[in-house]
Amino acid sequence: MKNVTDSFVSLGHWPSAGSFGFNTDILATNPINLSVVLGVLIFFGKGVLSDLLDNRKQRILNTIRNSEELRGGAIEQLEKARSRLRKVESEAEQFRVNGYSEIEREKLNLINSTYKTLEQLENYKNETIQFEQQRAINQVRQRVFQQALRGALGTLNSCLNNELHLRTISANIGMLGTMKEITD
C-alpha cells in the first residue's frame, strides 16, 4: 500500500512543464476561481440556454402545427379528390351503362325496322305476283274466248245461211258486251 501512496505523492511533485500530472496545490490550480466562473456561466448561461431551447422548442412546435395544418388540408383535399373521383366513376359507369342500353335499343330498333321493311317488301311482292297472275289469267281467258268465238263463227258461217248467221252474230255480240261489262 505504501507503494501506491508513494506513487501519488510523486505525481504531485512532478514538474508541470512538458509533462502531464496532477497538481494537488489548491491555490495553484484555482479551483475556487474555476468554480466561480462555472457558477456564473451556469447562472447566466442557464437563462440564455433556456431562451435558446425555448425558441427552438417554439420553432419546432410551430413547424409541427404548420405540418399538422398542412396535413389536415392535404387530407381534406384528398377526400375532396376521392369524392370527385367516385362521382366521376359513377357518372362514367352511368354513361357506360346508358351507352350500352342505348346501343341495344338502337340495335333493336334497327332490327324491328328491318323486319318491317322486309314485311312490306314481301307484301308488295305478293301483291305484284297476285296482280300479274290475275292479269295473265284475264289475258288467257280473253284469248281462249276469242279463239272459241272464232271457231264458233267459223262453224256458224259454214253451216248457217245469211239470216241465221246475222241473228247469231247479233246474239253473240250482245253476249260479248255483257261479258265485257262483267270483266271490267
UniProtKB/Swiss-Prot annotation:
Membrane topology: Single-pass membrane protein
Reported function: F(1)F(0) ATP synthase produces ATP from ADP in the presence of a proton or sodium gradient. F-type ATPases consist of two structural domains, F(1) containing the extramembraneous catalytic core and F(0) containing the membrane proton channel, linked together by a central stalk and a peripheral stalk. During catalysis, ATP synthesis in the catalytic domain of F(1) is coupled via a rotary mechanism of the central stalk subunits to proton translocation.
Spans through the membrane: 27-49
Superkingdom per UniProt: Eukaryota
Compartments it resides in: Plastid, Chloroplast thylakoid membrane
UniProt entry tagged with the keyword Plastid: yes
Family listed: Belongs to the ATPase B chain family.
Extra remark: In plastids the F-type ATPase is also known as CF(1)CF(0).
UniProt xrefs under CDD domains: ATP-synt_Fo_b
Phylogenetic lineage: Eukaryota, Viridiplantae, Streptophyta, Embryophyta, Tracheophyta
Protein name: ATP synthase subunit b, chloroplastic
Disulfide-linked positions: none
Signal peptide feature range: none
